[in-house]
Amino acid sequence: MRFYIGLMAALMLTSVLRTDSASVGQTGTKSELAVIERVIRQRDAADVKPVARQNEGPGRDPAPCCQHPIETCCRR
């Protein structure tokens, strides 16, 4: 019996949380959208993986280069 009461309470709580999050999403302001965009950009920047690339010229060793809008290469 306790199991069913707990299950019903959990289902009611999740339905309340879903409706609250849906109402917040519908009334989002520009500042909330800016925060979301900034978080997405930070997450995408953290996902950047270094890629080995050959430097031009004879006798040069490969340097790790970042895949980034502004490509920055650095020596090892």
From Swiss-Prot:
Keywords: Disulfide bond, Hydroxylation, Ion channel impairing toxin, Neurotoxin, Secreted, Signal, Toxin. One of its GO terms (cellular component) is extracellular region. It is found in: Secreted. Expressed by the venom duct. Its main location: secreted. The keyword S-adenosyl-L-methionine does not apply. Contains 2 disulfide bonds that can be either 'C1-C3, C2-C4' or 'C1-C4, C2-C3', since these disulfide connectivities have been observed for conotoxins with cysteine framework V (for examples, see AC P0DQQ7 and AC P81755). Coiled coil: none annotated. Residues 1-22 form the signal peptide. Belongs to the conotoxin T superfamily. The cysteine framework is V (CC-CC). Probable neurotoxin with unknown target. Possibly targets ion channels. This is Conotoxin Cal5a L3. It comes from Californiconus californicus (California cone).
